[in-house]
Amino acid sequence: MKRILLILLVMLLIPAGVRGGTVSYPKYTFGAEWGYIGTFYSGYHYNFYAPEGYRMDPRGHEFTYDSNAEAYIHAGYNLSEKYNISLYMGLSALREYHHTLPLSIRLTRFYGEDHMKDRIFAFIDLGSGLSVKKNPQEILTGKIGGGYRISLSRNTKLDFMVSLRSVLTHPDIDYYGTEIPHEKINRNNAYLSAFSIGMALTF
């Protein structure tokens, strides 16, 4: 009986993918992702008190183009051979506004039965984060995209992806060369739309 219990304990401690049990794919994933961000649209709505004392309420939108970069690390869990859910955290830049520390959850759907073969995939990513500035504020972000996965080995995958994203952030307000103090700001919302091209290495 003791020998049987010991064998069962060892089997529970060894991941199923290692012992060649019910699943042929690794259950846990880790990796890094790098990308280019091309922001093509931005809108804003500010409400603040000017240095002269009166209240300002500017708002507007514009189609311009700005280039930025981003980098993430991620850890996830393979729900099946076709679905993965992962937590992403990293560093990203938003136009000339500021850098951000995003944290998001991504659900990925892979197409194809065999994880050892190259496959296409689609994903949706939703999250929040903090702006990196004197007075940090929360940001909200969402993206949807897809890509192509190259299977380098059972555990190592190389991904190439494209996506569209929307971001709500809160930049500092510059009023004719004067930065408005945080306590004088009632609203500093900015909305950004962008596309991104990236690559990732997953283990």
Predicted regions: what they are:
Residues 19-78, 133, 194-203:
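Short glycine/proline- and aromatic-enriched beta-strand/turn motifs that initiate or cap beta-hairpins
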Residues 1-27:
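Cleavable N-terminal export/targeting peptides
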Residues 38, 72-143, 150-156, 201:
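Gram-negative (and chloroplast) outer-membrane scaffold detector with strong preference
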Residues 28-39, 100-106, 161-163:
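Conserved long hydrophobic alpha-helices within structured protein cores
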Residues 39-48, 57-62, 91, 144, ...:
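Predominantly the C-terminal beta-signal and adjacent terminal strand-loop region
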Residues 12-16, 141, 157-159:
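A broad helix-preferring feature
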